[in-house]
């Protein structure tokens, strides 16, 4: 389940390394923020980007 409804208008900023349009997110999910590493796709709870960079720490 992805709480990020990316079909809505808005912006999803992933730290300072990524900005996604057409997305209304309070937290960056992989579905709207492609800067997350591919490994996060294996995370059951999804990928949440935190901080200024997106790395394996986004996996929860």
From Swiss-Prot:
A divalent metal cation 5 binds at residues 33, 35-36, 49. A divalent metal cation 1 binds at residues 4, 6, 20, 23. It comes from the Eukaryota. Keywords: Metal-binding, Metal-thiolate cluster. A divalent metal cation 2 binds at residues 6, 12, 14, 25. Residues 1-28 are annotated as: Beta. Class I metallothioneins contain 2 metal-binding domains: four divalent ions are chelated within cluster A of the alpha domain and are coordinated via cysteinyl thiolate bridges to 11 cysteine ligands. Cluster B, the corresponding region within the beta domain, can ligate three divalent ions to 9 cysteines. This is Metallothionein. It comes from Chelon auratus.
């Amino acid at each position: 389940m992805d709480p990020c409804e990316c079909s809505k208008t808005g912006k999803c900023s992933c730290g300072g390394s990524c900005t996604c349009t057409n997305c209304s997110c309070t937290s960056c999910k992989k579905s709207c923020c492609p800067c997350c590493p591919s490994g996060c796709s294996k995370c059951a709870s999804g990928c949440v980007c935190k901080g200024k960079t997106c790395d394996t720490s986004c996996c929860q």
